[in-house]
Amino acid sequence: MAKYTKEIPAVKEKTFTAVTTEVKEGYEVLQFKDQGTPMPYIFRDNDEMVITFVGSSFEGEYPIIEEGLFTGLEINNRSGNMELRIPVDINDTWGYLVDLSDNTIKIRIKNSVKEVESFYQPLSGLTVVLDAGHGGKDPGSLNPKGGTTEAQLNLEFSSFVEDRLVALGAKVVNTRTDDTFVSLWDRVSIFNDNNGDYFVSVHHNASVNTGVNGVEMYYAQDADKKLAESLSKDMSDVTNRKNRGPYQWRQYVLRSSLGPSVLIEAGFVSEDKEFIDLQDETKQILSAGTVADNIAKDLVRRVQVAK
């Protein structure tokens, strides 16, 4: 088992004296109720999560946790830092979130999502957050000759993705449904606040080289590479656009560790022929189908790995 050995600098100490646990539907929460939001350093391997809060200590009554994801929790004070060791099997969880809002520490760990035994609605019980990029004061990428903006295309494409996801049984939460500006912070917050299972950000690309074309997918977490890879190939196949492959990129909206995230670049608005093709409703519907279908395939793959 890997060990957490990174040297962490100590800062002015915050002392915590109370800790509670709470079981919610689909996840559990560990909360330190005293004032303070110290910087967390997180390390995780297959059977343990280690969270170190810089410049903090725990001086309260040691919690007795007899069941749930936090069973076996260890709290240690080391070199001016508070260290939590949570012996949780990665296969028993879907994702996690360390929330430092409201001057408290809340650690949320999601239970592993279960595969649904339904041929027609394999995504029943799943929450997918759809993020139509840009909007409002931010039109996104533009074709040099004008016309439909990327923000408009993102919204149109997202609506088709939503239709297909709902047909497969998923609950869909949109970061925007009209031409309004939504900050990157708020987009991620919508995912976290709704305890999302998947996050899909929809975009269309552009380049100063107007001859560049094709589909691209972006992911941040290593575990999401297969989803991005498969989706890039399938969208390329149904649209006959070049498959430019998946790229790893720690873009802000992809950084949440609560669940799988992928950012779609469906094509290049800067290339004239592809710009026209991106506005074709049939191609939009076909592309949307690959998004929903790949989420369904990815869910099955992750559940099988966890067994």
Task: Specify the residue positions occupied by each region the protein language model found.
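Conserved hydrophobic/aromatic pocket- or pore-lining residues that grip, position, or stack substrates
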Residues: 130, 154, 200, 231, ...
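Active-site-adjacent mobile loop/cap segments within catalytic or ligand-binding domains
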Residues: 201-208, 218-219, 247-307
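Active-site histidine-acidic residue metal-binding/catalytic motifs
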Residues: 108-190, 194, 273-275
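A short, glycine/acidic-enriched catalytic loop
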Residues: 138-148, 207-230
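Stable alpha-helical elements in mature extracytoplasmic
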Residues: 150-153, 157, 161, 184-187, ...
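Active-site-adjacent substrate-binding region
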Residues: 224-247
